[in-house]
From Swiss-Prot:
Gene transcribed to yield this protein: rplM
Pfam families: Ribosomal_L13 (PF00572)
NCBIfam families xref list: rplM_bact
Tree of life domain: Bacteria
Alphabetical list of PANTHER family matching this protein: LARGE RIBOSOMAL SUBUNIT PROTEIN UL13M, RIBOSOMAL PROTEIN L13
Name of this chain's protein: Large ribosomal subunit protein uL13
GO cellular component: cytosolic large ribosomal subunit
Length: 149
C-alpha cells in the first residue's frame, strides 16, 4: 500500500478562535498543536502541513497549576557562549503572556521546517480582541479545567 499524500487542492484550512481564560496552559497547548498539525482531519499526513490557523485570545488569563508560576523558568539562548538567559514564569506572564503560550505550543510541534511553518499559523493575543474578524474564525471550545490552587 502506498503512502497517502494529500494534494494542496485537497487541503481546506479553517480559522479557529480559542478563549484561553481559565484553561490550564499545557492542556491548551496540546489542543492548539493538534489543530496546527491537522491531526483532527481525515486526510492528515505527517509529512504535509494540513493544519488550520489558530487564534488564541485572553492569553493573560491562562492558568499554571501548582507552584509552576514561581518555580518553572523560561529559557532562551542568544547563540553566544554564556548566552543562556532565564526568567520565572511569573515574570514572563506579567511581561508577555502571549510568549508563554507560544513557547508551550511550539514545544509540542515538530522540530523542523514543517514545524516552523505550522507555528506561523498560530496567532496569540493577551487581550480579548484580535484583528482577524475578516477570516470569520470559528469558536473552538476547550473545557475550563481551572484546578483549585
Amino acid at each position: 500500500m502506498r503512502t497517502f499524500s494529500p494534494k494542496p487542492s485537497d487541503i481546506q484550512r479553517q480559522w479557529h478562535v480559542i478563549d484561553a481564560s481559565d484553561v490550564v496552559l499545557g492542556r491548551l497547548a496540546s489542543r492548539v498543536a493538534t489543530l496546527l498539525r491537522g491531526k483532527h482531519k481525515p486526510y492528515y499526513a505527517p509529512h504535509v502541513d494540513t493544519g488550520d490557523y489558530v487564534i488564541v485570545v485572553n492569553a493573560d488569563k491562562v492558568v499554571l497549576t501548582g507552584k509552576k508560576l514561581e518555580q518553572k523558568r523560561a529559557y532562551r539562548h542568544s547563540g553566544y557562549p554564556g548566552g543562556l538567559r532565564s526568567i520565572p514564569y511569573s515574570e514572563l506572564m506579567a511581561k508577555n503572556p502571549a510568549r508563554a503560550v507560544e513557547k508551550a505550543v511550539k514545544g509540542m510541534l515538530p522540530k523542523n521546517s514543517l514545524g516552523r511553518r505550522m507555528a506561523k499559523k498560530l496567532k496569540v493575543y493577551a487581550g480579548p480582541e484580535h484583528p482577524h474578524q475578516a477570516q470569520k474564525p470559528v469558536p473552538y471550545e476547550i473545557t475550563k479545567i481551572k484546578q483549585p490552587a
